[in-house]
Design a protein with these regions (language model features):
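Extended non-catalytic interaction/regulatory regions in multidomain proteins
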Residues: 1-22
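Acidic, low-complexity, intrinsically disordered interaction modules
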Residues: 20-84
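Mixed-charge, Lys/Arg-enriched low-complexity segments
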Residues: 4-6, 65-103
Length: 103
């Protein structure tokens, strides 16, 4: 199974709609002059989703040997309107989750 097929399966499972791969977009996000995210965001057309016609998806290295890869999907809903803003939304969610876990 290819990465694209894996991501299509995850989109179907999480969002309940089929997805067709549209394009692969390289994204690099920096903060204070340092690269904090660098990878390929896969863009999918969604078929029948009630709120959007696009999803962004990629694989994320968790750094956890027991669960090394995470499939990430972000729907094209404000503020995630481009591959870059989808990555930014993901990063912000990760920061919020980490802060909540520490509280």
């Amino acid at each position: 199974m290819t990465v694209i097929q894996e991501l299509q399966d995850v989109i179907l499972k999480l969002h309940g709609v089929k997805a067709t791969h549209r394009e692969s977009v390289p994204v690099t996000e920096t903060w204070q002059g340092k690269t904090i995210w660098d990878g390929i965001v896969e863009v999918f057309d969604l078929h029948g989703h009630p709120k959007t016609d696009t999803a962004y998806a990629w694989l994320h290295d968790t750094g956890d040997p027991s669960d090394p890869i995470r499939h990430v999907t972000v729907l094209r809903i404000h503020p995630a309107l481009t591959p870059l803003t989808a990555v930014r939304s993901f990063i912000m969610q990760e920061i919020q989750n980490a802060n909540a876990a520490q509280a």
